[in-house]
């Protein structure tokens, strides 16, 4: 794929973008992780109450008006345009109310789809819905252990009031990310940094989309690693276009140079 490719992800999406940087080496020229769900074992999904919160979450309302009122209350800190989009696309009419002018509505995405992000659905393999060991998803902790293998520059964009990206965790991210020089090319540099959006929480891209967009644009504009990756791609294409004789001459010259270095 032609570079630059820039990875941007929020929460679990940030974890998945970072994982792609490791499993699909050199896919991204840079990535921006917004309050990513990446953390040490003591902050893994098993330590949070996300499963319980999901099961308690309401998913149905008598009318669309009731649903809209509930969502506006729950997400009152969100930017108005973002909240309007959420209301527009997250609610649908129940089957029995399609022919009615106003009837029961439900969330488009139910509890199950969210719950399996946190807890593994063991009943699928065992066929038993009870009596099974409770196994939480390990992706955020797995990615924490792989941070040293990240293959591109990374910006951690975090909410100042987020309980997920607390200072201790941010320090761990910065100290571990891309430190093992995995799949690194000669002359390549990888920049790792953080930016904080004050007075926002874990939902910072929904609360302050303009501020987040400005920070992301500034990072992309100033990240020299993006230009470096594009140049590498062009050099690689030029090499492929050389004749075999020219490639052999270059290889011989390189080996001669190495003799003076090794």
From Swiss-Prot:
Pathway: Mycotoxin biosynthesis. Its EC number is 3.1.1.-. The keyword Cytoplasm does not apply. GO terms for molecular function: hydrolase activity. Its main location: other. Disruption phenotype: Abolishes the production of AK-toxin and impairs the pathogenicity. Pfam families: Abhydrolase_6 (PF12697). One of its GO terms (cellular component) is peroxisome. Keywords: Hydrolase, Peroxisome, Virulence. The keyword Phosphoprotein does not apply. It is found in: Peroxisome. It comes from the Eukaryota. Gene3D superfamilies: alpha/beta hydrolase (3.40.50.1820). Gene clusters encoding host-selective toxins (HSTs) are localized on conditionally dispensable chromosomes (CDCs), also called supernumerary chromosomes, where they are present in multiple copies. The CDCs are not essential for saprophytic growth but controls host-selective pathogenicity. Abhydrolase domain-containing protein; part of the gene clusters that mediate the biosynthesis of the host-selective toxins (HSTs) AK-toxins responsible for Japanese pear black spot disease by the Japanese pear pathotype. AK-toxins are esters of 9,10-epoxy 8-hydroxy 9-methyldecatrienoic acid (EDA). On cellular level, AK-toxins affect plasma membrane of susceptible cells and cause a sudden increase in loss of K(+) after a few minutes of toxin treatment. This is Abhydrolase domain-containing protein AKT2. It comes from Alternaria alternata.
